[in-house]
Amino acid sequence: MRPQKQHITTPLALAIAGLFSPAGFAEEVEQDTETMVVRGTAEEALKQQPGVSIITAEDIAKAPPVNDLSEIIRKMPGVNLTGNSASGSRGNNRQIDIRGMGPENTLILIDGVPVTSRNSVRYSWRGERDTRGDSNWVPPEMVERIEVLRGPAAARYGSGAAGGVVNIITKRPTNDWHGSLSLYTNQPENNKEGSTNRANFNLNGPLAGDALTMRLYGNINKTEPDAWDINRAQNGSYAAGREGVRNKDINALLSWKVTPQQIIDFSYAYSRQGNIYAGDTQYSNSNMSPNGLVDTLYGQETNRIYRQTWGLTYNGIWDWGQSKAGVYYEKTNNTRLQEGTTGRVEGMINSDVYDTSRLESWRSTAEVNLPFNWLAEQTLTLGMEWNHDELNDPASMQATTTTDALPGVSGDPSQRSPKNSATLTGIYLEDNIEATPGTNIIPGLRFDYHNDFGSNWSPSLNLSQDLGDMFKVKAGIARVFKAPNLYQSSEGYLLSTRGNGCPISIADGNCYLLGNPDLDPEISINKEIGLEFNLNGYNAGVTWFRNDYKNKIVSGTEILGNTATGANILQWENGGKAVVEGLEGTLLVPVIADTLSWRTNATYMIKSENKDTGNPLSVIPKYTINTLLDWQVTSKFSANVNWTLYGRQKPREYAEIRNENGVLATNKVGSYSVVGIGGNYQLMKDLRLNAGISNLFDKQIYRENEGASTYNEPGRAYYAGVTISF
């Protein structure tokens, strides 16, 4: 008997309601009297819809990322890669930014579970981290699909989802033995750019019939760093290129079908990521390195992250509805050479001694989904989450020494605690109501309690309305939040500057920046409205969005007091307001049915402004257009052409710190485009080849020390891959 699928037909309702699970926001259930399989909804109908984008395994195979999944996620509507501020520091460590809200407001999930390893990396005075982010823990070949959720629907996922949610879903075990071995290489034409080589395997099958199945995969990857002199010299030093990375991953999943309707998953993962240093110093000032240490470290490993996770997940189907529960543990050891915490040498390696910060996270979730008919067909979701994070970072919390007397803070580092923790408990409910045929109303409410700032309410309302057979309008509004991170709220976290790094409003003296345990959460009111068109495979849509942001946590400008030597005492504080506003558009044209398709999306940023400073929240293109022409030439061979156009990028216009007064660089990055071609050939049933050229016309962007040119856009490169299945 074939399983009967339970579908929610509208993309927004499916994304929000689906299985209604924060641990898997677009899941679907298949069941019959003999078996139950809980899996994700990678339905083609969801692709390129307002607020929801789906990247399938086939999409990844046709345009494989060089190493990091962010490279393909960035091609979704509303998504870019950027730093967490407009400062430009750590410019080549760009992370996923959704709707201009910054990487810290993008919640990354793997199989529905939050990933927080990047939070083990020190948070700088300017709001940046020396991290690659959390989108590189799963090799591309092991991904079943990636779901990108934008807009008000993200409110149900709690802290850190003000921009949106990225859910990376891995391949499930199968009831028959299968395996694969994949090899991939990427070779740049410019010998100053780093090459990449990757190998991984996947093995899955039954251990005891279909009652007990397993999946095991492993991955090893090496990306070389850019040459130390890839960027032109400025002020006696080079802006660093992209650093290299070595990845090693092992992941195991054991799935126990207790009954046909009850499944328990046991999971374990271990990863090691080590960098290959390219010379970045946060402020591109390697000429200030003590004893030329930065220069001697090029090509060496200066930081490495060890990540381990354990998980236990339960899924059940009952006569009355569905249930899900899970407990998870994540431990990250972040080991790196000691870095400065003072002024222009903040973030610069200043020692050959390694220190380790440890971040441990415990999580538990539970929810039920109750379908019923009272006045209208509806499904009510009730759930809870408990999260506890502990950070132990002696190198950051106990680095700054001062002879000044600071209220409540010891000048002796050994007297300051290296630890900080936070507990966040949330409960939520959501009701997916089909008020009339073609009308779905989805009210929601989430309540969170934080051990420091107390309570927070996050209401949301989403609407989907059919307008005849071809058009549909969707709208939503939600209040979303982000809790202070464990550096901002730590009383032991102390940074200092001799004066040049003080806020521009402070004319004299040096400054100390203290942690603040009394911070309130950041708040954003997210709104969107969109119109969709569907007819005979043709699909088009346009969405307007606006996020009104307040209480953004920033390094303080208000002087709390002065030390005996006249130094100014500041602390992390809740700032004023900001606004992000823009348009997203999508278009799908089946040029020749089942043979040739043309898919395009576009993002246009109307406004991105911190109302306190007048500067943008982050440096992103004014507009981005992604287009793909996909041709299924034969049943075995497919080819594609992809093109991305980036609009101009403007840097900050207004000085924020003292040494920028009158000398702030305003050089822009003009619009430019990147074209790629690729092909896939199924040579035999168990042998697949792919190859292509990225950046076909060799458009390169070189990083500069200041302005909007904060990153390297790599030039033409040739890639090839092979996958052997058995």
Enumerate the language-model features and the residues they cover:
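Short, acidic, small-residue-rich periplasmic hinge/interaction motif at the N-terminus
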Residues: A26-K62, P103, D111
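N-terminal periplasmic accessory domains that precede
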Residues: L69-I72, R94-D97, L109, G133-N136, ...
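Extracytoplasmic beta-strand/coil segments of soluble accessory domains associated
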Residues: S70-S117
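Short acidic/polar hinge/loop motifs at secondary-structure boundaries
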Residues: P114-R150
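C-terminal beta-signal and adjacent terminal beta-strands/loops
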Residues: T116-V121, Y549-K550, S555, L645-E656, ...
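Periplasmic-side early beta-strands and strand-to-turn transitions of outer-membrane beta-barrels
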Residues: T174-L297, N551, R648
